[in-house]
Amino acid sequence: MEGPFQLVESVIDTVVTRATPAVFLIRRIEETEKYAYYKGRLGRAPHGTLRQNLKRWLSSDYRVFCFEYVQGENAVFDRQCMLWHNLGGPAGKLDNEQHPEPNEGQTTKCPVCFSNNSRHNP
């Protein structure tokens, strides 16, 4: 992923240069008495909507973003799922409560869940 970048309009307009599908991660800092850590939210942006998707979070408590251009809508969903699992979902480093779902009309399945189910259900 590219970034992290400051989540401000001028930076978004500068670094988001392509109108292709993408996945993104926005982050905020959580603090405890002993340490601070990033907590984030994953999202996906269909063809040409990354700027708009990021800008809707400008007034939130998220402060930085990373993104990755991905070729094709199924690949966007696959990448978002992989990141969701790698970051531990809501029990880990994400605010996303729910596992990513494919867009309406997509028949793709999560590559991680599908792989795990295949191993346990021959």
Where are the regions that the model predicts?
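Boundary/linker segments flanking structured domains
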Residues: 1-36, 42-122
